[in-house]
Amino acid sequence: MAAAKSALTDAKLDASTIADAQRFGVLIGSGVGGLESVERSCEILSTKGPRKISPFLLPALIGNTATAMVAIAVGAKGPNFGLVSACATGTHALGEALKYLQLGECDVMLAGGSEAAIT
């Protein structure tokens, strides 16, 4: 989230400077995502049983959660999805975002990758 907001600040963009939020997209990739949630849930499962697993486990694991949260925070309403391409995920997101710009489907794309597979 901090990197996304910093990128927009560096580009001198925000929701008020983008004429059409439908033409403002976000593509952020993550290679693993949610690893801490998996570890925590495994511990809960083994010590407290399956009924104590959070109903929010799946949303914490899916690859597009970061993209969705950033899009909501910055007011982007255009293309919005997450990518998973192992170590190439960030570059893959940049390439896909470039296609939207080249095809004239979007005016602004916020793209990149993020990972912290440490717990």
Model-predicted segments: where are they?
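Conserved FAD-binding subdomain of flavin-dependent enzymes
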Residues: 1-10
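Acyl-thioester C-C bond-transforming condensing/cleaving domain
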Residues: 9-20, 28-119
